[in-house]
Regions:
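Conserved GNAT-fold acetyl-CoA-binding loop/helix
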Residues: 3, 23-45
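Conserved beta-strand in the GNAT
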Residues: 57, 63-71, 78-83
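Conserved GNAT acetyl-CoA-binding A-motif
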Residues: 105-117
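A short helix-loop-beta-strand connector motif used in the catalytic cores of GNAT acetyltransferases and
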Residues: 43-57, 78
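A short beta-loop-alpha structural element at the N-terminal edge
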Residues: 2-18
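Conserved acetyl-CoA-binding loop-helix of GNAT-fold acetyltransferases
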Residues: 84, 90-103, 126, 130
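Terminal substrate-recognition subdomain of acyl/acetyltransferases
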Residues: 130, 134, 139-163
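Conserved beta-strand-loop-alpha-helix junction that forms the acyl-donor binding cleft
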Residues: 115-124, 146
Length: 163
């Protein structure tokens, strides 16, 4: 059975390694090699909790196996991050966590959750598509970071973007 609960400070030591691994995974989508930094993961969680972001954790058999962070811009609910331990994937953990985000959105009268997604994150895109999330809502544009190596081009309609 999967248990979903609102995160408290006491869970930081057990969830921080997952946050650190999530950041490594995101960097890998950009071709950047990184290593988990649990102290940064703990700091990130503290920032979320201090800012009042709803953070949910998942447990199976009493052990933490995933987390989800929401940001609320009333009435919109954004999923900032969703991570499940690799050995627990495809077992309903992400779905159970995401249901909590959708319930939070419903509590504000909304029928959708907004998701920031890397364009080459096929795993989360497939997950969201299966849940009916198929509308490209917006594109985030920024200047390249100093030293950033942009290796791909992505076309949306007539526009070509570096990635």
């Amino acid at each position: 059975m999967i248990e979903i609960e609102r995160m408290t400070d006491t869970a930081i030591p057990e969830i921080a390694p997952m946050v650190a691994q999530f950041r490594v995974t995101l960097k890998a989508f950009k071709g950047i090699t990184a290593f988990p930094n649990e102290a940064e993961g703990a700091s990130e969680l503290r920032e979320y909790l201090d800012a009042g972001f709803p953070v949910f954790t998942a447990r199976k058999d009493g052990a933490y196996c995933g987390y989800l962070v929401c940001r609320v811009d009333e009435p919109c609910v954004w999923v900032e991050s969703l991570y499940v331990l690799p050995e627990q994937r495809r077992q309903g953990v992400a779905s159970a966590l995401f249901c909590r985000a959708e319930a939070l959105a419903a509590s504000y009268g909304e029928d959708t959750v907004y998701n920031y997604v890397h364009p080459n994150n096929d795993g989360i895109i497939g997950f969201l598509n299966a849940r009916g999330y198929t509308v490209l809502n917006l594109i985030e544009l920024r200047k390249p970071y100093a030293g950033e190596k942009l290796t791909q081009k992505i076309q949306v309609n007539e526009n070509l973007f570096d990635y």
